[in-house]
């Protein structure tokens, strides 16, 4: 696969995704958005390491919106590492001493390649990370709890960075914990836990189907929805940011959610369609079951136990609900600590296991291959590009990909990722700020290939 066909900086690429839009009005909105200051790429990701001058920051603040950030241009480099300047946030605090991660570097990983989805061989890991088109900012790979590879071409290690949809893995993990502990019956309708949505199409959605992204509602976050400023996805993100929608109106989150419509002829559980809108509702479910704010529950169950170096910052909607589908922020090393709790090396970061075997088993087995195949998950560009020769069996419990061997992966917008492989005792995490819809993210393939190679050592 030749990435030169996807040169990010070229405005000539815009028609590639404009042609998929549903209406001329949407085309015009995207074209206008691409002309705004900071929407296109002129800066390398290394600019984040150097910092930005006041003129740049002032411009980023003036242009801030959910859609402007989605474009992944120069301003997005500032948003992904300084997001708490724009949306209110709460903090899940660490507790106790920092869990030190030993460095046992394996230089040979820099030369790692893998067979991509089209059967071709990738460039080396180091070459990909150093390629300015990749927009990778930080990568870490750990084996048996030790850091065996790390690189920070586009951020400082101590900087906080947005998780984007990697955050969904946290929501799914917490709900699976609650299910395993008998605190929730996941066969019940999701509106039993979110009364504000009673009387809407959400009444037809069992909690377990929402957890597995098979709601039967027309709320998919496909490529078109991501770039359509009037989609349900962009509307809910705008409501959470507290910024006007495409029609200039600041919407209430529950009003947006109540607008969801059922897909004709499709019942919940039949087709898995990726959706941040679903996870938005699941965060409210966690709060209803526990009687705690989402942030405090994350702190109690996970963040205070992993020896994190920094707080986990979680943005809040104007109504105070945590934006748990994407607006979490931490250092990359703390994300790696979180990834370790799913592996046999959990003891490196915690004095007790946080993810019970039953919880892990449910996430590894509790979904439908038929719903996965029928839905849009296999069509995601990163799935095709990385795993056409090694396909996941399904998505599950908010994880995007689960393999037969039990490995799990969650991808995030603007190209973030978490790979955790319990059988091989390997985790991989990465941050980036890459425009959506312009080129596939190839880092996930390196993570899985590294796990296979390291397990043989």
Where are these regions (language model features)?
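Bacterial N-terminal signal peptides that target proteins for export
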Residues: 1-10
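Bacterial N-terminal signal peptides
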Residues: 9-19
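N-terminal leader/targeting segments and the immediately adjacent pre-domain N-terminus
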Residues: 22-155, 212, 216, 449-457
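Short, charged, amphipathic alpha-helices and their helix-cap/turn boundaries
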Residues: 128, 146-150, 192, 226-267, ...
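Active-site SXXK
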Residues: 145, 162-186, 210, 282-286, ...
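Active-site helix/loop module of the DD-peptidase/beta-lactamase fold
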Residues: 180-223, 262-263, 288-325, 330
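Active-site-proximal alpha-helical segments within enzyme catalytic domains
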Residues: 213, 278-285, 324-348, 416-433
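Active-site Gly/Thr loop motif
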Residues: 309-313, 365-429
């Amino acid at each position: 696969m030749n990435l030169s066909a996807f040169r990010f900086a070229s405005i000539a690429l815009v028609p590639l995704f404009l042609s998929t839009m549903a209406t001329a009005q949407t085309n015009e909105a995207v074209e206008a958005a691409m002309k705004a200051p900071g929407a296109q790429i002129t800066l390398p990701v290394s600019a984040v390491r150097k910092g930005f001058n006041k003129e740049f920051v002032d411009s980023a603040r003036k242009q801030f919106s959910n859609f402007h950030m989605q474009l992944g241009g120069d301003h997005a480099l500032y948003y992904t590492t300084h997001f708490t300047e724009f949306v209110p946030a709460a903090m899940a605090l660490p507790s106790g001493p920092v869990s030190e991660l030993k460095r046992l570097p394996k230089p040979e990983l820099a030369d790692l390649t893998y067979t991509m989805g089209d059967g071709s061989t990738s460039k080396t890991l180091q070459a990909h990370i150093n390629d300015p088109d990749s927009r990778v900012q930080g990568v870490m790979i750990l084996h048996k709890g030790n850091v065996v590879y790390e690189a920070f071409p586009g951020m400082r290690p101590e900087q906080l960075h947005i998780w984007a949809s990697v955050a969904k893995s946290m929501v799914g993990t917490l709900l699976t914990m609650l299910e395993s502990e008998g605190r929730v019956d996941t066969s019940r309708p999701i509106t039993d836990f979110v009364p504000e949505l009673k009387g809407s199409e959400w009444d037809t959605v069992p909690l377990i189907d929402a957890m597995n992204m098979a709601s039967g509602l027309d709320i998919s976050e496909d490529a078109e929805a991501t770039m359509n400023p009037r989609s349900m996805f962009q509307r809910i993100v705008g409501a959470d940011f507290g910024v006007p929608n495409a029609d200039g109106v600041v919407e209430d989150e529950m009003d947006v959610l109540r607008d969801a419509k059922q897909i004709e002829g499709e019942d919940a559980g039949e087709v898995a369609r990726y959706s941040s809108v679903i996870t938005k509702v699941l965060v409210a479910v966690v709060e209803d079951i526990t009687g705690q704010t989402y942030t405090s529950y994350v702190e109690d169950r996970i963040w205070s136990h992993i020896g994190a170096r920094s707080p986990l910052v979680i943005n809040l909607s104007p109504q105070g609900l945590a934006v748990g589908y994407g607006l979490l922020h931490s250092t990359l090393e703390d994300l790696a600590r979180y990834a370790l709790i799913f592996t046999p090396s959990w003891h490196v970061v915690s004095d007790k296991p946080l993810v019970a075997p039953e919880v892990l088993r449910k996430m590894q087995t509790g979904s439908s291959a038929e719903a996965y195949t029928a839905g849009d998950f296999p069509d995601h560009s990163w799935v095709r590009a990385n795993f056409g020769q090694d396909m996941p069996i399904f998505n599950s419990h908010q994880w995007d990909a689960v393999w037969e061997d039990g490995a799990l992966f969650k991808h995030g917008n603007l190209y973030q990722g978490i790979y955790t492989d319990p059988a091989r005792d390997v985790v991989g995490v990465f941050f980036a700020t890459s425009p959506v819809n312009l080129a596939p993210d190839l880092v996930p393939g390196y993570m899985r290939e590294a796990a296979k190679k390291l397990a043989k050592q």
